[in-house]
């Protein structure tokens, strides 16, 4: 089993995300093969300025929907202070994982923006083609 390490976001992916999101993403570290994600039983989990992946960053970067879902958590929730560990746990206790407001918001954000990110990535030279299953059924569990 590999141990976690920071992965570089490919330039084409970074450019497309920044164009769509309207802000820089360079301060967000992507950690692949993370024990933290594995401990949480998640494909990915986030914290302030961090996306922790169970698997490879290469696979993550080919999935526009999942990238948007995770970057939404980091940029629109953790970074603004609306998402904290205690708030997330309370939401899960009150509403369950699927219906907690942070997951609902991230799924809606990804649903709304994935087609545009898919197009931006497809139009970018030297980008990997988006993953055919661009919207996983359970996205990521926190």
Go through each PLM region and give its residues.
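Metalloprotease/metallohydrolase-associated module, dominated by Zn2+-dependent proteases
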Residues: 1-42, 46, 78-142
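Short pre-active-site segment immediately N-terminal to the catalytic Zn-binding motif
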Residues: 41-44, 50-68, 97-98
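Active-site recognition of the HExxH zinc-binding catalytic motif
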Residues: 65-77
